[in-house]
C-alpha cells in the first residue's frame, strides 16, 4: 500500500507545478561553464542522446515514421534529442494537466490484496479529489501508406570497416492489435522464417552471402502491430540483391507451403512461453498488464489478450487451409502498408552532429544579452543548490515507511534439499511450477585461463545451433522448439570474496513434465555429440555474436563500465570479463579477423572433453517431484563421460588502473569502484537504497 501511494502521488500530485528544478533536472537545462561555454544537460536528454547512438533505435524510429505519418507513433516516445530543447516548462505542465488525469486513466490491479482497502485509497485519497476533465479519444488508425525508401546514417567507430555494415529493413503493418490470431500467427512465422540460422529465410540468405544475420520481429505494443524484417551487415552493392533474394525465398515458401513440422514446433514453443508467463526482469503482474491494455485501450475486453484458451487449437486447425502461406503474401510480399529503410554506416556522422550541436550552442550563447546569461547562471545555481539541500524533516515525514518490526527477519523460504541422483549431487526445489520442470546442470570450470573461459562461453553459444551425431542443425532446431520450453547455456561466476570465486558452465532446460524426457535426451545429445568444427555455422555465429556484443557495449555502456572497473580488484569480475564482458568481445573480434579457425576448433574439442562430464557436475531440478523427471535426469547423467577435474590458477584481478573504451555515442559512461572488505547483506541493501531500485 505504501508503494501504491508513492506511485499515485507521482502520477497525480507531482511537485512539478511548484518545483521547476524537477523539469530542468529530469528534462533539460542550459549550463555555462567558467569559460562561458554553453552545454545542455538533463536526465532524459542524456538518456535519449545515448539511445540515438543505437542503430536499432534509429532504424525502428525511421520505420515508425514511415508507416505511421499521421499518428502519434511517428514521434519518438522518449523524445528526439534534437527536439527535446523545444519543450518548455509551461508546455510540460500543460501536458501533465491534459494527459495525467483520472478521466484519462485506466486502473489495473494485480496481486494478493484487500480489494476494499485498495479501492477506498484510490477513491478517497486520489480520484474523488480531482476534478473530472475531458477524456481524450484514442487516435484514429493510420490508413495504408507505401512510403518511399529511406536511408539513415548511423555512427560506426573509425576502426570498423564500413563496407559490410549496411542494413536492409522492411516494415510491414500486420493489422490491428485486437486480431490476436493474426498477430500470434505472425509471431509463429517469424520463428519459422528467421528464428535462427537454420530457419529457411536466414539459411538461404546466409548461404548466398547476403548478410550476416536475418531477423524478423513482430512489434505488437501498438494499435497496428508491424513486422520488421531485417538483413544485417550487408555490403552496399548487395542491398538490392538482398531485397530480391528475400522476395524470391518468401514467394517460394508461399507457393510451395510452409514446412508443417517447423510450424508445429514453433507453435508448441510459443504456446509454452505464453502459458509460462515468464516476463524476465518485469514483475509478472506488470507483464500481464501489457496484454490487458493492448485490448482494453482499444475497446476490447481486458482479458482478451491474456488468456491463451483455444488460441493454438484454432491456429493448428488453419495450418492445412493455406492460411499461413496467405499471411506471407498479404503481410510480407503484397502489403499496401509498407516501407523500406537502409541503414548506412558512417565514420563521420557522429562527429558532424556533435560539431553541429556545438555551433548551435555557440550561436545561442552569442545571441544572449548579459541579463539572459545571468538568468541561466542563476537557474543553474538554483538547481545546484536544490541538489545539495537536504529534505526538510516535514518533507521526510510525509514518506510512507515500514518499521523493521513490520519485516520478517527470516528470508523468503525456497524449499531446497541436497541429495544425490545418478552419482552426482542433486539440488531439489520442490514447488508448484504450472506442470513445468526446470533442470540445470552446473559444470565446474573454475581454474580455466581467461582465453579458455572465453572459448567455453562461445562453446555455449554453439550448443543447439550446430550439427550433432544424430541430427542436422536444422532438424535439431525444430526438435528443441517442439519438446523444450527453453534450452540455454551460460558461463556464470559466483564470488565469495575478492579472491575466492567459482565458475560454472550452466546448461538450463525447461519443458512440460510430459516432454522432459525428450528434452533431456536432446540436451544429452547436444552436450556430448555437437560438431564443434562445423565451419559455416561457427563462422556465422562468431560474426553474429561479435556484432551483438558490440551493440551491447554501446547500448549498455554503464554495465560494461561497472564490470570493467570491478575486474580491476576482484578475481571473479576479471573472469566475468572473459566470459561475458569486454575481454570476451575482444576475443571474438580477434577471431573474426582470422581466416583459419582450425585452432579454435581444436580448442573447443579439447575443452569440451575436459569440462563436460560427471566429475564436478551438480544438477538442480525445480518443480513438483516426479519419478519420470528423476529417471530422465539419471539417464542423462549416465550418458555423460567421466570428464576431468578442472585445475589451474584461473584469472587474477587486472590491477587498479585508469582506462577508457571509445564507443560511437554522444553520451559517455563512467564507473568507479573499490574493495569494501568482506561482502555481506548490508552492502546489497545499501546498493538498492542508493540506486532507488526498491521502487520496483
Language-model regions, residue ranges each:
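Generic recognition of flexible, low-complexity loop/linker segments
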Residues: 93-97, 155-158, 201, 215-219, ...
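Active-site neighborhoods of enzyme catalytic cores
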Residues: 17, 24-42, 47
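Extended, regular secondary-structure scaffolds
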Residues: 115-134, 256, 334-337, 346-382
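His/Glu-based metal-binding/catalytic segments typifying zinc-dependent metallopeptidases
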Residues: 45, 49-53, 57, 135-198, ...
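Extended alpha-helical coiled-coil "stalk/arm" regions that scaffold and mediate dimerization/assembly
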Residues: 322-327, 370
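Bacterial peptidoglycan biogenesis and beta-lactam-recognition machinery
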Residues: 13-17, 54, 115-116, 126-133, ...
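Non-catalytic, conformational "gating/processing" segments within enzyme and secreted inhibitor domains
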Residues: 41, 90-125, 600-635
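M16 family metallopeptidases and their MPP-like homologs
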Residues: 1-13, 19-31, 57-82, 104-110, ...
